[in-house]
Amino acid sequence: MGVLVDIQNLYYSAKALYGKKVNFQKVLEAAVGERVFIRAIAYGIKTVDGQEEKFFEALEKQGFEVKTKDLQIFPGGVKKGDWDVGIAVDAIKLSKSLDVIVLVSGDGDYIPLVQYIQSTTGCRVEGMAFGESTSAKLGEALDDFIDLSENKKKFLIYSRN
């Protein structure tokens, strides 16, 4: 089984919904459960100041392979940084040799990807995300879905103050 994590999707969902950070270690543990995982990939965006380097290093220590790309800044200041196509390509490649892929994102753009993998490879596609920010149609397309909002204490980092 493989786990593919859209860091930006999860990070911004947790921040917007709860003002908290995600405990990615607990997310990985819940995704894997009792199964043997072959690969866990976290997809992130590097900013100009490189503030996230320590975070990416921590993810690697937790068992993730971290793939990064630079934040694009367009004329006029518009910023763009997403991994949708990269995640889709990796998911299709991996689905040929895995029995389960867990997609950690609530982005409805992944619906065609989920349907394609299910219909062509027989690989199960499961999902994890915060229910309030997850596309309902994505949830329906997945073989199984874990709503991280149902166990916030486990999946969010609360300060000790």
Regions found by a protein language model. Give the residues of each.
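Terminal and domain-boundary accessory regions
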Residues: M1-N161
